[in-house]
Amino acid sequence: MSSRDYMNTSVQEPPLDYSFKSVQMVQDLVTEEPRTGLRPVRHSKSGKSLTQSLWLNNNVLNDLKDFNQVVSQLLQHPENLAWIDLSFNDLTTIDPVLTTFFNLSVLYLHGNGIHRLGEVNKLAVLPRLRSLTLHGNPIEEEKGYRQYVLCNLPRITTFDFSGVTRADRSTAEVWKRMGIKPKKVRAKQDVL
């Protein structure tokens, strides 16, 4: 199968789905059996999955140590990985390993513990990234969260499952020109 044929077929392939498996470490994926869906994931002669989507959501991952190596063991063409779902884990940073997947177009990181808005800047090197989720992380509480993300990732067309509008783009552009930085929202203290 040529690389071009692979690209055309694997986009329509179901994801390699390790969601809801209580996975604690990325290395555990090598021995863990993926979930099965209505359509099974096809495999190459070497036994690797022919898909461009990897779902690791609803687990207990707190880092992505050895992510590249494990993905290379699981997927026939890891360089073509286009969709990674890491939502509802225990991640506190955006691991730079994610920026090595240049064909990544969908990245779900919602429902984690990412607390520094600057982490988003790491994703600017991904030329095909179009859909990103970050809601449900502590960074969502910062004023200007949406504008900051859109300012730093101008190619995004869907953010937090919501389409990016012209008004969103315009506001983000103003923020960029003015050099506005988001501010942490302080919790109100009850006065006795």
From Swiss-Prot:
Its main location: cytoplasm. It is found in: Cytoplasm. Keywords: Cytoplasm, Leucine-rich repeat, Repeat. It comes from the Eukaryota. Residues 137-175 form the LRRCT domain. InterPro entries: Leu-rich_rpt (IPR001611), LRR_dom_sf (IPR032675). Signal peptide: none annotated. GO terms for cellular component: cytoplasm. The keyword Cytoplasm applies. Widely expressed in adult and embryonic tissues. Expressed in the developing choroid plexus from 12.5 dpc and in the epithelium of the developing airway tract from 14.5 dpc. Also expressed in the postnatal inner ear. LRR repeats lie at residues 49-71, 80-101, 103-124. Gene3D superfamilies: Ribonuclease Inhibitor. This is Leucine-rich repeat-containing protein 51. It comes from Mus musculus (Mouse).
